[in-house]
Amino acid sequence: MTVELPEGYKPSPKEEYMSPMHLEYFRQKLLAWRAELLQESENTISHLKEENWQEPDINDRATLETDAALELRTRDRYRKLVNKIDSALSRIADGSYGYCDDTGEEIGLSRLEARPIATLTVEAQEKHERLEKQRRDD
């Protein structure tokens, strides 16, 4: 079932939570973000291929290598984000999108608007982070 969104549509708390319109809105948002990240990754690859790695000056070469390492770390971060976006798109397809993995409660439109790949409510995320911090401190 394809839902056509009105131009400028934003999900409203007055609507049924995770209605077909909500799901289509977030699906489109995630797909656009995914496309943007993939384009950035392509740009990084192109840039690295075009770079002159035979820079005669050792300082210039060191700068190039540092910049390349930073670009590759960013690309790796993008790859991980694309995986999370793909997971979110799968949750939209199976009907579990928008609900907390831990509690089953609604994550909330404002949180999903800010972080459409969120899998936990704010409270569950805070609890998770506290537990992680305790494990690191032990």
Region annotations inferred by a language model:
Residues 100-103, 121:
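Short cysteine-rich clusters marking metal-coordination/redox-active sites
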Residues 118-125:
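Cysteine-rich micro-motifs
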Residues 79, 97, 118:
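Residues immediately within or flanking Cys/His clusters that coordinate Zn2+
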Residues 107-108, 129:
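Short functional micro-motifs and their immediate structural scaffolds
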Residues 25, 102, 116:
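Amphipathic alpha-helical recognition patches that constitute DNA-binding helices
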Residues 110-114:
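Short Cys/His-rich "knuckle" micro-motifs
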Residues 30, 104, 125:
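Cys/His-coordinated zinc-binding microdomains
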Residues 1-94, 131-132, 137-138:
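Interaction interfaces in information-processing and related assembly proteins
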